[in-house]
């Protein structure tokens, strides 16, 4: 067999063993994908004993390409929610998530300054302690740019030493906070449901009858506040006639308007127009038909709703738009993206033509457009290769293969569509590419780390590294958890989601969800902080490397 064939075969064995180890669970908690790292360490230990050498060039390519795939697909996954998570609605949770990252980084600086732990080792400990593999890749990239050599083995070993307690430490923090504050899970779930009850309906329906005679003869657009984003009138009932009103439709006393939109604006409409009444849904249907349509027609991507003119041509209206799980009230200036789910209302006679205009090809949602994938990867690698100088740093720095693809993926996922190119990726395809990437990366890192792993653990600094990893895992989580409970007044289940999300750890989220399966508090908090924290976890080791390199 050729060297390349031997290398690929051994890495495949590493992946099989590692994934098998990752499926082992103790009380529902396992290593997950991190098992691949330990599979690599085990195989490498025996390969070293028998003198088996793998092709270095192949190992290097597999490691870097796996990292690129993983980081890029992470960016595509979290991109749509990354920028929205920075908005005010999730400000409190994101500040607390950022605090966990900052506290961990400060501990790294302190430990490095008061001990003799090498820079590559402390960055590996940091990545393992926070159970974040992209952080490990980013740290390796920046140290290479700074001129450090032969760092993969040390970083991989220190990462592996800290990783196991990184997982256990999250669960231990949840348990200690629960014990310290004497938490009643059922009561916390009830409190969450009660507190969020008012906010569950971001879009509400209302039937309002016009009793204010001042609006008789005025156009629909003349209603104060009607032009505000966040409200739409989808039907007008006048005696026995039901139709979709235009902006210039003249109003009459007794008209019943069916609105969708922001509850606050709807309340204003009630005060201005007349009274809110209960009307059976069938009574407001008439000859109108409602359909749920998916945008898949490449000809209308990136176009504004007003330019399609379907409202004027067919009398059809879009009442709601769902994009990446977020429900919106569209305006005439809303730009359509691939995968947008539209709720449209119109005459049954023309509905089929309108559906054809939007595409509604459900099968396309399961297809991956490969051209945008490689365009994004190429642009990411290009961006990561552009050097920039920072005063005091001896060499120009780069975002590298971890930072470049991540930044580009975040931007492209947020943009969504450029011409006929769209960066929508089916969740199953994204997960497959992401898992392949991380398995490739961890297989090589584990194999390169395994030769001296046992010796380092028994005779070297392994136990010391493990202790510092426990410190970096536990202290930031516990401090932030207490602050979140006492000062931020967060629900305990939300704190569990915050803790899991700040460590970007799905097994921890699964554990948090199992505390109260019918309550979505943990999942909501996890999803809120995940995009920003993932970005900070990848950027933080690079900033730490620059800071500590300057201090050397």
Swiss-Prot record:
Residue ranges constituting the RCK C-terminal domain according to the UniProt record: 190-275, 277-360
Transmembrane segments: 4-24, 28-48, 65-85, 91-111, 157-177, 373-393, 399-419, 438-458, 463-483, 492-512, 529-549
InterPro entries: AAE_transporter (IPR050144), RCK_C (IPR006037), RCK_C_sf (IPR036721), Transpt_YidE_put (IPR023018), YidE_YbjL (IPR006512)
Pfam family, one: Asp-Al_Ex
Disulfide linkage: none
Record GO terms (molecular function): monoatomic cation transmembrane transporter activity
Record bears the keyword Glycoprotein: no
GO cellular component, one term: plasma membrane
Protein keywords: Cell membrane, Membrane, Repeat, Transmembrane, Transmembrane helix, Transport
Record localization: Cell membrane
Topology with respect to the bilayer: Multi-pass membrane protein
Top-level division of the source organism's lineage: Bacteria
GO biological process: potassium ion transport
Keyword Hydrolase part of the UniProt annotation: no
Record-stated family: Belongs to the AAE transporter (TC 2.A.81) family. YidE subfamily.
Protein name: Putative transport protein Asuc_0023
């Amino acid at each position: 067999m050729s060297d390349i064939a031997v290398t690929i075969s051994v890495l495949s064995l590493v992946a099989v063993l590692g994934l098998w180890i990752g499926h082992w669970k103790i009380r529902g908690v396992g290593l997950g994908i991190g098992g691949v790292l330990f599979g690599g360490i085990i195989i490498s230990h025996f390969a070293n004993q028998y003198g088996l050498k793998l092709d270095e060039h192949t190992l290097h390519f597999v490691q870097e390409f796996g990292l690129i795939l993983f980081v890029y697909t992470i960016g595509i996954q979290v991109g749509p929610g990354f920028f929205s998570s920075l908005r005010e609605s999730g400000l409190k949770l994101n500040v607390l998530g950022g605090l966990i990252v900052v506290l961990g980084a400060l501990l790294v600086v302190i430990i490095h300054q008061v001990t003799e732990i090498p820079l590559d080792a402390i960055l590996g400990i940091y990545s393992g302690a926070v159970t974040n593999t992209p952080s490990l890749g980013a740290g390796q990239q920046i140290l290479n740019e700074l001129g450090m050599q032969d760092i993969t083995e040390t970083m991989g070993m220190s990462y592996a030493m800290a990783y196991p307690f990184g997982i256990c430490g999250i669960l231990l923090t949840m348990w200690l906070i629960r014990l310290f504050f004497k938490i009643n899970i059922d009561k916390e779930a009830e409190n969450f449901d009660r507190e969020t009850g008012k906010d569950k309906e971001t879009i509400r329906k209302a039937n309002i009858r016009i009793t204010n005679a001042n609006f008789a003869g005025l156009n629909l657009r003349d209603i104060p506040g009607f032009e505000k984003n966040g409200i739409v009138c989808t039907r007008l009932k006048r005696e026995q006639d039901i139709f979709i009103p235009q902006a210039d439709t003249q109003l009459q006393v007794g008209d019943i308007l069916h609105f969708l939109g922001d509850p606050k604006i709807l309340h204003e409409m009630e005060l201005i127009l007349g009274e809110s009444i209960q009307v059976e849904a069938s009574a407001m249907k008439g000859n109108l038909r409602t359909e749920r349509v998916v945008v898949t027609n490449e000809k209308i991507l990136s176009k504004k709703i007003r330019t399609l003119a379907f409202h004027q041509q067919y009398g059809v209206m879009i009442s709601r738009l769902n994009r990446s799980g977020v429900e919106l009230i569209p305006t005439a200036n809303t730009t359509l993206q691939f995968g947008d789910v539209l709720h449209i209302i119109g005459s049954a006679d023309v509905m089929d033509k309108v559906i054809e205009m939007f595409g509604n090809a459900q099968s396309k949602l399961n297809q991956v457009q490969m051209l945008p994938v490689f365009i994004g990867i190429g642009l990411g690698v290009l961006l990561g290769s552009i050097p920039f100088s920072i005063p005091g740093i001896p060499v120009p720095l780069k975002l590298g293969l971890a930072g470049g693809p991540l930044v580009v993926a975040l931007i492209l996922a947020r943009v969504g569509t450029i011409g006929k190119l769209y960066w929508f990726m089916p969740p199953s395809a994204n997960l497959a590419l992401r898992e392949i990437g991380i398995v490739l990366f961890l297989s090589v890192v584990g194999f390169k780390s395994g030769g001296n792993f046992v010796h380092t653990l028994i005779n070297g600094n392994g136990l010391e590294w493990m202790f510092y990893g426990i410190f970096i895992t536990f202290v930031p989580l516990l401090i932030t958890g207490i602050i979140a409970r006492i000062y931020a007044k967060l629900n305990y289940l939300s704190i569990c989601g915050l803790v899991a999300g700040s460590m970007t750890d799905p097994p921890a989220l699964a554990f948090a969800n199992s505390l109260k399966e019918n309550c979505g508090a943990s999942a909501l908090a996890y999803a809120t902080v995940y995009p920003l924290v993932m970005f900070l976890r990848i950027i933080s080791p690079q900033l730490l490397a620059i800071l500590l390199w300057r201090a050397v």
